[in-house]
């Protein structure tokens, strides 16, 4: 394994090897990251990368697709079974492209959409001005209540009544609480809007029964496959049957060309894994870990946005320690704890500075970590945040992190190949 890469391109091999070591020796706490299984990576690295397969299964524009058809059929049927969906398209290369396909399948340029503000925890593709969704469409943004820091459903209702959007978008990238999908459906119905849910962050938790499913309520559900779902990097779309043909033609040929069949194979494997009892246990443990992490950080003097979490996400307000998000990200990185700076609702700081950090427990849980490990990690995080420039303290934390990581080895079967 990797011997050919090492022989052909030493520079790339060395970069890959160093990244393998970084993943082994760091606590991965970026909420959108996770570790795929050996099987998922083997599927993605298979000969399917050589095959063009424009079109849909059994309706291809190329010959020789009989075996990739089997793979895509498996991915579609497994995905529909996991979420109880009527229609599924597994070809989107990313969550962003999945969202674009839904928008363009139903909307015209200039139509009004409503999505959660990026500044309050939404995603770029939900109508942010710098994104295509906010350029092509008239985007109205809702947010959280300043007191509770929970989605302000009264505001959502008022904005919907005022602006009459053709589509309402629910879902977020930095919102830790349960989203009331039924409430969004009720509001959408009242104003005659379609409802799209972007469940990218929560998809794995939903598959494992640890977070409510939006599928019974939404006309369209989009997602990535690589966050809590633990698959390869990619996307998918679920929809009511009546929208299936529109979705399919907007994914191909209107937005994409040939699907990535090696990635679709990896998606199929990940979907099979997501139907196991082991995956269900992982999903519930991920939420348990996040709750313990949040409580421990609160006990150490930090403020948790909204007061806690119902998911894998913990959004931390650093202002009680007079620390900025970019400072925290950099210092924690020196201690081998990988996080990302993140705006908090009503943040006075600039986006590249921020007053907060976003933490996630999915990758740690995949490694096998549990509640006591979260308590240990929380104490180390706070120790760094209180000693940003104390290299002795940061080294002590790094040593403890290395010890913890060694107790939960990552890809042990591959170590000799990557670190040869």
Curated annotation (Swiss-Prot):
Keyword line: Amino-acid biosynthesis, Cytoplasm, One-carbon metabolism, Pyridoxal phosphate, Transferase
Domain of life: Bacteria
An MF annotation (GO) of this entry: pyridoxal phosphate binding
InterPro entries in the cross-refs: PyrdxlP-dep_Trfase, PyrdxlP-dep_Trfase_major, PyrdxlP-dep_Trfase_small, Ser_HO-MeTrfase, Ser_HO-MeTrfase-like, Ser_HO-MeTrfase_PLP_BS, SHMT-like_dom
Enzyme class, broadest EC rank: transferase
CDD domains hit by this protein: SHMT
UniProt pathway: One-carbon metabolism; tetrahydrofolate interconversion; Amino-acid biosynthesis; glycine biosynthesis; glycine from L-serine: step 1/1
GO annotation terms (biological process): glycine biosynthetic process from serine; tetrahydrofolate interconversion
Compartments (UniProt record): Cytoplasm
Residues noted as binding (6S)-5,6,7,8-tetrahydrofolate in the record, renumbered to the chain: 118, 122-124
Cofactor: pyridoxal 5'-phosphate
Residue numbers of N6-(pyridoxal phosphate)lysine PTMs: 227
Site-annotated residues for Plays an important role in substrate specificity: 226
Cited function: Catalyzes the reversible interconversion of serine and glycine with tetrahydrofolate (THF) serving as the one-carbon carrier. This reaction serves as the major source of one-carbon groups required for the biosynthesis of purines, thymidylate, methionine, and other important biomolecules. Also exhibits THF-independent aldolase activity toward beta-hydroxyamino acids, producing glycine and aldehydes, via a retro-aldol mechanism.
Family: Belongs to the SHMT family.
Subunit structure: Homodimer.
Name of the protein described by the UniProt record: Serine hydroxymethyltransferase
Organism of this sequence: Persephonella marina (strain DSM 14350 / EX-H1)
Gene symbol of the encoding locus: glyA
């Amino acid at each position: 394994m990797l011997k050919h890469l090492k022989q052909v391109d030493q520079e790339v091999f060395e970069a890959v090897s160093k990244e393998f070591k970084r993943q082994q020796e760091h606590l991965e706490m970026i909420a959108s990251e996770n570790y795929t299984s050996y099987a998922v990576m083997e599927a993605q690295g298979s000969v399917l990368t050589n095959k063009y397969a424009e079109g849909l299964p059994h309706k291809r524009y190329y010959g020789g697709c009989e075996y990739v058809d089997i793979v895509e059929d498996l991915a579609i049927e497994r995905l529909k079974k996991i979420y109880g969906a009527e229609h599924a398209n597994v070809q989107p290369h990313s969550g962003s492209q999945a969202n674009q396909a839904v928008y363009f399948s139903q909307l015209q340029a200039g139509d009004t959409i409503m999505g959660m503000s990026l500044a309050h925890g939404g995603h770029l593709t939900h109508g942010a001005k710098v994104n295509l969704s906010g350029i092509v469409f008239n985007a109205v943004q809702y947010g959280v209540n300043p007191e509770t820091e929970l989605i302000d459903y009264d505001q959502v209702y008022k904005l919907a009544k005022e602006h009459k959007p053709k589509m309402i978008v629910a879902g977020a990238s930095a919102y830790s609480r349960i989203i009331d999908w039924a409430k969004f459906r009720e509001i959408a119905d009242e104003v005659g809007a379609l409802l799209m849910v972007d469940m990218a962050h929560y998809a794995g938790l939903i598959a494992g029964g640890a977070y409510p499913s939006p599928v019974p309520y939404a006309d369209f559900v989009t997602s990535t496959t690589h966050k809590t779902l633990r698959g390869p990097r990619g996307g998918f779309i679920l929809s009511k049957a009546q929208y299936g043909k529109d979705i399919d033609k907007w994914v191909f040929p209107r937005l994409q060309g040939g699907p990535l069949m090696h990635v679709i194979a990896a998606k199929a494997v990940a979907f099979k894994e997501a139907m196991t009892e082991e995956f269900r246990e992982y999903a519930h443990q991920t939420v348990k870990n996040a709750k313990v992490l949040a409580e421990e950080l609160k006990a150490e003097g930090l403020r948790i946005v909204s007061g806690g979490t119902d998911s894998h996400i913990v959004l931390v307000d650093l202002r009680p320690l007079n620390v900025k998000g970019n400072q925290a990200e950099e210092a924690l990185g020196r201690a081998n704890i990988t996080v990302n700076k993140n705006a908090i609702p009503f943040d006075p700081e600039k986006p590249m500075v921020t007053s907060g950090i976003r933490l996630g427990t999915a990758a740690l849980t995949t490694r096998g970590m549990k509640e006591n490990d979260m308590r240990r990690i929380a104490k180390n995080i706070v120790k760094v945040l209180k000693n940003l420039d104390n290299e002795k303290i940061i080294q002590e934390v790094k040593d403890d992190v290395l010890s913890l990581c060694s107790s939960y080895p990552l890809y042990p079967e591959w170590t000799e190949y990557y670190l040869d």
